[in-house]
Amino acid sequence: MKLPNEIEEYLVSRNFSENTRSNYYYDLVYLQAFFEDKSVTQEALELYKHQLSKLSPAAQRRKISSANQYFLFLYENKKINQFFKIKQVVQKKTQSSESYHPMIKEFPEFYGPLSCPGQFLALLILEFGLNFAEIQKLKWENFNWNFKYLTIEKAGIKRVLPIREKFAIRVKAIKNADELFAKSRQFLYTELKKFTNYSSKEIREQYILHQVKAGKTIYELANLLGLSTITALEKYYR
């Protein structure tokens, strides 16, 4: 069975940012080129995986993840009559990767009755992975409470982030959020510090850890965070 070229159809069906779309495109073109003169068989998939072994472990995992998602799309849309999946590579642990294992925290104290601006800021960072610069660009109208999503625009790219009910029930009654969003970075820093000893960076990392635990791919997570590259996230996928 030949590998059909449905790359454009696949990318159109996904709500990727321009950068994430570009990453998937090149990964899938690489896959398509390999199978140009080969049939898709389990043996051929093993050969493809072997060819990837010359790349870094992170690049191998990325290309395999892209390929597996593409195979699933083809199978679900009846473009191929058999589902194929490449087994992910197991990255050998190195001293650097072993030394970085941050613990996931739940922060139940963040989800009490809303009592101060710092608590609202902490929730924005933990629920959406926002930094202070992104919070300063928010408008209350960006929150769609009917359909439970937050729209953020950064460098001309829009991100649509889901709003969880546990966040909505605590903050949607706020009347003066735009006043907070208009404050200086120093003001936001001070208010967060009044509420918790955790820094914005530490809280944002917890958002990342929870998304990794939930099964988000490195590309999906980069898209959620509005990142133009995946470099800063690779350590969480080792």
Swiss-Prot record:
Enzyme active site: K154, R204, Y236
Tyr recombinase domain span: 90-238
Keyword Isomerase among record annotations: no
GO cellular component: cytoplasm
Keywords assigned by UniProt, alphabetized: Cytoplasm, DNA integration, DNA recombination, DNA-binding
Predominant subcellular localization, coarse grouping: cytoplasm
Role played: Putative tyrosine recombinase. Not involved in the cutting and rejoining of the recombining DNA molecules on dif(SL) site.
Record's protein name: Tyrosine recombinase XerD-like
Organism annotation: Lactococcus lactis subsp. cremoris (strain SK11)
